[in-house]
């Protein structure tokens, strides 16, 4: 398991699928960093904790490579007062379960 702390700022993106979901891009090569494509993580969005997964939802980077994302729940967006288009600070560490 990778114990590295990943920390970055990102713009909240609006999902084009579903009912108004939102996400941030994970700007690292997930397979190179973790050795797999889906990674369970402890994350924080502007300090608000969240347990979820970094996943491939079929989104592509401009160069055509796979874009991995981390979803942001509406409840968390409400707590931190941020919506799609806003910049947030994210911390991520891998979790076992």
Spans of features found by a protein language model:
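Short alpha-helix capping/helix-loop boundary micro-motifs
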Residues: 29, 72-79
